[in-house]
């Protein structure tokens, strides 16, 4: 029971990924909508600022952060692969190409599924509670994991921390009653 609750707690923010089923694909009319929005921004926006590299960079950062705010799902190699679009989202949108967000989502979904499998296996093995370890739980400024080994270690500590929080909470509740 505890393992299921813990897995759910750690991956709850990712549930929509599993519920969606097949990988969503951009519909043909999305490109036309993107082109119209790009045109309207430059013509009708109060500041009359069209899409440019600065806006593209901000959109890129916002998208990556919205998918992985604590830098635990994407690998450094994923971010490096996405980097080529940092200053090119504006150009793609102007051309009606909306494939980049779908590619980011596809990679994110793969990473979530991988983390789900990792956590499931980890919970089946249990934890060594006699080790002196530390865990950085606010990772918004931390580097992206270099590889799956680093990511696995990060997640092992993360799940162990969640487990300890639950155990200690239960013990405090029992002591208070």
Regions found by a protein language model. Give the residues of each.
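Flexible, low-complexity junctional segments that flank or bridge functional domains
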Residues: 18-177
């Amino acid at each position: 029971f505890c393992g299921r609750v813990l897995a759910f707690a750690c991956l709850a923010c990712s549930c929509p990924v599993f519920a969606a089923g097949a990988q969503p694909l951009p519909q043909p009319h999305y490109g036309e909508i993107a082109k119209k929005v790009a045109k309207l921004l430059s013509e009708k926006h109060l500041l009359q600022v069209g899409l440019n590299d600065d806006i593209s960079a901000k959109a890129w950062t916002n998208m990556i952060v919205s998918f992985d705010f604590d830098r635990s799902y994407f690998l450094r190699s994923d971010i490096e692969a996405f980097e080529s679009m940092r200053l090119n989202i504006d150009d793609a949108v102007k051309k009606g190409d909306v494939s980049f967000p779908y590619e980011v989502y596809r990679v994110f979904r793969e990473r979530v599924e991988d983390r789900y499998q990792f956590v499931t296996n980890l919970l089946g093995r249990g934890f060594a509670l006699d080790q002196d370890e530390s865990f950085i739980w606010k990772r918004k400024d931390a580097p992206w994991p270099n590889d799956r080994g680093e990511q696995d270690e990060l997640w092992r500590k993360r799940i162990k921390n969640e487990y300890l929080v639950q155990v200690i909470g239960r013990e405090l509740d029992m002591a208070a009653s």
